[in-house]
Amino acid sequence: MRVRAERHRSGARLCVRRALLLALLTLWLAAQHMEAQLVPNLGGQRVGISAFQFLKIGVGARGVAMGEAFVAVTDDASSLFWNPAGLVQKMEDQVFVAHTEYVADIRHEYLGAMYHLTEADAVGISLTSLHMQDMEITTETQPLGTGRYFGFGDVGIGVSYARKMTDQFSFGATVRYVEETLDMLKMRSVMVDLGTYYWTGLGTARFAVVITNFGADVTPHGNLTQLDGTPVDDFQSFSLPTLFKLGFAMDPLLSDHQRLTTSVQLNHPNDNAENVRLGAEYAWQNTFFLRAGIKRTIGQRLLAADETSEESYMLGAGFRVTTEISTVTADYAFAQFGRLGGLHRFSLAFTF
């Protein structure tokens, strides 16, 4: 019996090693595919080469208030956006809604739900929307308006799965369908997010590696005519806003009554400069929360203003109450966006 049990444990360890190797190999292959876009321009500006920019808008007040240094912290339904491997960090089912008052009267909405199939497996579904009021069309000869209006909007639907391979290592993936509409033009794409979450075993230290919005280039299609009536049938292709994220977090203060979580994250986008995110969250009685975070572009001084980005600092707070039906968590975040003003985010989570 002892020999059989030992063989069983050895076989389980072998399966875990294979799963870990497969997950890391998948992330490595994805990174290699992006190498031509990312590595040669390390630290450079690559603005304007990708579509579906709404996919870069942070979801949920908690993650945003921590400076978006969140891939190694997320453990709720907002993991559907930040890191799908976060879905199995807690044995909780949750419905999550978020609203962002973005710049120029643009509104960003997010709805997500997660459900545990077993203690080690979880699935989730998410819906993202970016919308604004229709705008009047202007031309060189009619600068005050033509009387015709155009609309713009984005929508994304994602399905996620996460599995806890061991007590320390988790892996998750999301498949997302995205559609963007600009007047008579549309762009559609299917993309993938891949994420890992690893507890090091050294206290509360953990790190995460995530690749989001990974997929093929997209090309607009639709009926478009120039001012002289000439139809346009040749459109430029755009890459997806692929983003590689590496995060590390730990709890330097952890007791029965209070907790302090700190996090640092490196973001490596294919359409902008690399940047570092720093964040912190203080929790009292797991009921009241205070959060803060900053973003700095690589090459900028940490404690000085970032001269290359409108994003600066983030602040936020939240509270949690338990009802007969569920536990409700309400969060708020403020993000300073330089000359564009401040952004306000609100989110609610219903945990069952």
Regions found by a protein language model. Give the residues of each.
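N-terminal secretory signal peptides that target proteins for export/translocation
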Residues: 1-16
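Subset of outer-membrane beta-barrel
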Residues: 37-352
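Sec/Tat signal peptide C-region and signal peptidase I cleavage site
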Residues: 30-36
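Short intrinsically disordered, low-complexity coil segments enriched in acidic
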Residues: 1-3, 22, 113
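Bacterial N-terminal signal peptides
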Residues: 19-30
